[in-house]
Amino acid sequence: CLLSRGLGDVYKRQVARRLGLVAINTALEADIFGNINSTHVSGTRMMNGIGGSGDFTRSAMLSIFTTPSTAKEGKISAFVPMVSHLDHSEHSVKVIITEYGVADLRGKSPIQRARCIIDNCVHPDYKPLLEEYLAMGIKGHTPQNLKCCFAFHEELAASGDMHNVDWSKY
């Protein structure tokens, strides 16, 4: 059964949740903690607008983001240590889907989310790099390492291939 409602109803969170709204949106990149960049390539070049995805994502009973695990013949990973631009925070993102699987992030801590995303969604070529990043993260609730969290983006700009990240430089 398909139910059609006006945007005024959908934008009201309590109405949208009561209707069981499921929001499915596209991600350009996601970080291993579940933050999503839907609009900017490498954080600076706008690829598309955000439209109403923020309202739908925050209001939905279930918010799902889909993305291929890589782009440009595997040289760009859709999953990075930290997104270069933030459109949707981990607080609104419930599920991420790629051709490799589904990461259900509901009720998980940042480290649990990272492991779930790496295990289920990341391209096999990038899993070791992201596992190493997670292991070297600063101890804390969200183990980011600000000295190297943008290494994937820096390597893409320098060599054109995120595979070439070398954590020993950091």
Residue spans of the language-model regions?
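Single conserved hydrophobic/aromatic residue that forms the stacking wall/gate
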Residues: C1-L7, Y11
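A short, aliphatic-rich alpha-helical micro-motif
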Residues: S4, A16-R18
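Metallocofactor- and cofactor-centric catalytic cores in central/energy metabolism, strongly enriched
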Residues: Q14, E29, F33, S42-M46, ...
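Short loop/turn motifs at secondary-structure junctions and domain boundaries
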Residues: R18-L21, D87
